[in-house]
Amino acid sequence: MAAKSDGAAAVAGPGPEGPAGADRGGAGGRGEVAAGIAGPGPVEAGCPGPRYELRDCCWVLCALLVFFSDGATDLWLAASYYLQGQSTYFGLTLLFVLLPSLVVQLLSFRWFVYDYSEPTGTPGPAVSTKDSDIVGAAISTKDSAVAFRTKEGSPELVPRPAPSSAGAYRRRCCRLCVWLLQTLVHLLQLGQVWRYLRALYLGLQSRWRGERLRRHFYWRMLFESADVSMLRLLETFLRSAPQLVLQLSLLVHRGREPELLTALSISASLVSLAWTLASYQKVLRDSRDDKRPLSYKGAVVQVLWHLFTIAARTLAFALFASVYRLYFGIFIVAHWCIMTFWVIQGETDFCMSKWEEIIYNMVVGIIYIFCWFNVKEGRSRRRVTLYYCIVLLENAALTGFWYSSRNFSTDFYSLILVCVVASSFALGIFFMCVYYCLLHPNGPMLGPQAPGCIFPEAPGPCGPPADAITSPPRSLPRTTGAERDGAAVGGERAGTPTPPVFQVRPGLPPTPVARPLRTEGPVIRIDLPRKKYPAWDAHFIDRRLRKTILALEYSSPATPRLQYRSMGTSQELLEYETTV
């Protein structure tokens, strides 16, 4: 099955390479995606997938608690300003709550519309399985609805029977109810709450269901968790970060002890920022089979790391903005431009189109105003060190300018704030060192993996079989004319025939190894090179590809594998053919 970027589907025949071979076909152009069943490939029956545990459920519940506490304290504080007659503070506080929420709800509802919509004139994706050796998947296209069925490795197209009138009526009623419910949820600004609850439901279903459905629900739970983590990351840096700077600036400007409500709002915004960053990194690592997952200990230490560094950063901003408001605005814009240019210069590869990549880089530039955010593959030690050296100098300069405007002899309160900025930043750097030295998940997940195994857990069963060819032929060194002549003359002089160009080295007879029984399962081939960490895989951000994969995955009696196109394999094959 091939899914192009325009939503159409085509059928691809069985591939000879199986689950471990690379996709040697396809144009590989930008924006063109092929998700195909590459034929029956060996999938070990004894390869269990990850399980949804109680701590995963508790993590989602804590995320919901952080979400509600952040929004509730901000709205409560805005109402307090309104009752006190402070219309300016009320307007700014409410603006930083409603505007980011509206943007995120529109984006969330747009995702829902695409995920739940159907092409015009065709029914939606329908899947069915009858026997263990039959895989049936009906994939919608723009022109017609067809069913793709493989039996004993041979694909064929069969027309899908039209649904009965009663079934079609019930289907339309159910769809209408879902549309009304989702519209109401997003109008109430609860789209993220719905996605959190849905991720929780899918995770629990993956724990309670059988093996095949367990994998299916776990896969959908990862998709939902990825969506809500990206939405929360966008919202927190559009809402919580400006709200935190605003309330701290007002607090410093008034020069009095904070009220309980103001302190709660500041604390909730700070925790929301730190929690969202750690949660995003955890979901990103959990979604990639080529990286070790982030443990909950590491996630908690990440929360503390970001909590203290962002606290020092925002307090330095608030101190400077309380005295030099115009210069603070110039500083923020200049810092954002420099950081955005730095990100663009690094040539990130997160999105599927150029314009989406530019918007993403601009959002990352906003994040870099407050904290570190890894967007480039490879070792990040030098980049982290450079970033925090710049942040340290900026914090010291902003705090120093503010302190120079105070009365040195009598204002002991100012000295305390300077010490708070310094100690908070030092604590954040300490927790960052603890994370990278003790809790950072280094290395590939459980050793080398077959490309794209959806649910890897043990390296043995999930890897390629022993009789599969996993590496392409290497390029041969060119033979010069002198070497050819010398070899010919030497062979004639010695009176011995010239040895053959290719020789087969005798090896030891294969030792029989007991292997578990295998069931035949499809390999879903994606005609795109796999994005490297810390980018999301294409099947997480391309919703067309996601819909096709979910339909194929649900219809297969055995767990399919995702297989991205290997750029290195294509280059090596081309070099080999040219050389020989």
UniProtKB/Swiss-Prot annotation:
It is a multi-pass membrane protein. It is found in: Cell membrane. The keyword Transmembrane helix applies. One of its GO terms (cellular component) is plasma membrane. Residues 1-22 have a biased composition (Low complexity). The chain crosses the membrane at residues 59-79, 89-109, 260-280, 303-323, 326-346, 355-375, 384-404, 415-435. Its main location: membrane. Residues 1-28, 470-516 are annotated as: Disordered. Keywords: Cell membrane, Membrane, Transmembrane, Transmembrane helix. GO terms for biological process: apoptotic process involved in development; engulfment of apoptotic cell; phosphatidylserine exposure on apoptotic cell surface. Belongs to the XK family. PANTHER family: XK-RELATED PROTEIN, XK-RELATED PROTEIN 7. This is XK-related protein 7. The lineage of its organism: Eukaryota, Metazoa, Chordata, Craniata, Vertebrata. The gene is Xkr7.
